[in-house]
Each structure stands twice: as structure tokens, then as C-alpha cells.
Amino acid sequence: MHKIIIIMLFFLVSITWGTTWIAMKIAVETIPPFFATGIRFLAASPLLIILSYLTKKPLLFPYGQRRFQIFISIFYFSIPFTLMLYGGSYVNSSISSIIFANMPVLVLIISHFYLKKKINFIQKVGMVIALITLFFVLLIDLKSECFFQWKGILALLLALLSHAVIYVECQKKSCNVSVITFNALPSLISGIFLSIISWFIESPNINFFSTRSILAVFYLGNFCGICGILSYFYLQKRVSSFYASIVFLIFPLIAGFLEIYIYKKTILLYELWFIIPSGLGILLTLIPINFFKNIIRFSK
């Protein structure tokens, strides 16, 4: 039964993260990014607050960390998720997902410089492979599109950096609040904040919103935003972070194939070839220090 639960959680996380990028692209077809992100969080927050009540999880962070909760609302939710939708309107889903698949690599680099975390030789090799692969993927993609989508790529890289920094800062502050507490109130704050900003700078016209864009926003909020996040954190509790993070290797493939199916796009050959070294590099950065020692000990 335990193995079945793990497989189901792994499958659910892979599907939700893989479909997130195509849903973002559909959402911004007719809805401005600020407004789409705001409604996404406003749709998710009531369910998260209800879950908080049912599970008796506090909405507020512990004393001494409540300013950090506001900081998270802005720099983990409001800004990066808006940048992700904005970037997704320029960049295809497969490239967007490849960029975010490098999250473990960036977290490791920031942890090394900010928390003085040790990096073993295998992880260093993985970092080099992953970063070089990402560089060439972005360079080739930019050249193929005549550098049209550079704003989108920059937005996605900034969103990636913001998420990685907050993740490392949570480690530094020993922020061990439940996943529901982490998401519930910041989602509500971000939803209100972004919706207000949108009315001033985007002037959204609901009459122009397509049905599929509206459905995509609610899918992002109620399914990806709740099921995906909760499933990933529960998966981390049942298996090591190394095995849980293998999801980062799977969801770019799902995003790529969905884009082919929905938008009838042909996947470029270089994208297929670069998946192998990119996945290898990310996998090597996730390997814990004692992994090979345990293998050698077991073989003896």
C-alpha cells in the first residue's frame, strides 16, 4: 500500500507540473498575466483556508517569521508566478519547463554561497553539465526565433531565481511551517494584490476572455496550485528528496508532448538531444553525498 501511494503521488506531481506550463500558455492567450495570476491565487486561497481549518493548521507563521510571510507572498507568489505567465506567452512550454527543471541546480549553487553548503565532486560535474546544456538550449532557441522571445526567457529566469532564493532563505530561517500554512494566506494576499494592480496597469476586459483561458486559470489555481504542491510535499515526506526531485526530470517531457498535441508543433531535434545531458546534469546534482558510499558498502 505504501508503494502504491508513492507511485500515485509521483504520478500526480508529474502530471500537474507537466500540464502547468501548457495551462499557463492557454491562460494568457486572452487574459493579461497580472490578472490571470491574481485570479489563480484567489481561486486557490478559499480551498487552502478551508483545508487549514479542517486540518487545524495555523494561517499565520510563528511569531518572529510573520514579516517573512509577507516577503514570501511577494517574492515567492506574486512576482515569480506573474513572470512565469508573462514568460510563457513568449516561450514555448517545453523550453519553459526545461528552464524550471534546473531549480535543484540553482538551489544548490545559492546554498553553497549563501549557506556555505558543501558540494561534492559529482554534484559539481552535474552543475556544469546542466548549466552548459541550458545555455546552449536557450542560445539556439533565441537564434531560431531571431531573439524575439528574450523578454520571456529573462522573465522565466528571474522567476526561477526568486523561487530558489526563497527556498534557500526558508532553509536558513528554519521555516518549518506546514505546506498549507505556507500557501494559504500568501495566496490570498497575492491574489488581492495582483488583481488590484491589474485593474490599474492592464485594464482587463472580461468580455475578451475566452472560455478555455478562464478554465486554464481555474485549473492552475484549484488543481495545479493545490494538488500539485500538496502532493509534492507529501511525496517528500515519504521518500528522500533525491527520489522526490526526479519529478524535475519527468515534467519537461510531459510539457513538450502536450504542446505538440495541443498546438500541433513539431518538437525540434536539438530539444530531444539536449534532454539527455540536461536530465543527467540535474540528476547528478540531486545525488546526496553518501549515495555512492552506501552503494559501495552494500556491494561489499
Swiss-Prot record:
Keyword Transmembrane helix belongs to the record: yes
Alphabetized InterPro entries for the sequence: AA-Vitamin_Transporters, EamA_dom
Positions of the EamA domain: 15-139, 161-287
Organism of provenance: Buchnera aphidicola subsp. Schizaphis graminum (strain Sg)
Transmembrane regions listed in the UniProt entry: 4-24, 31-51, 68-88, 95-115, 120-140, 146-166, 177-197, 214-234, 242-262, 272-292
Stated name of the protein: Uncharacterized transporter BUsg_270
Keyword Acyltransferase: no
PANTHER family membership: INNER MEMBRANE TRANSPORTER, PROTEIN PAGO
Cell location: Cell membrane
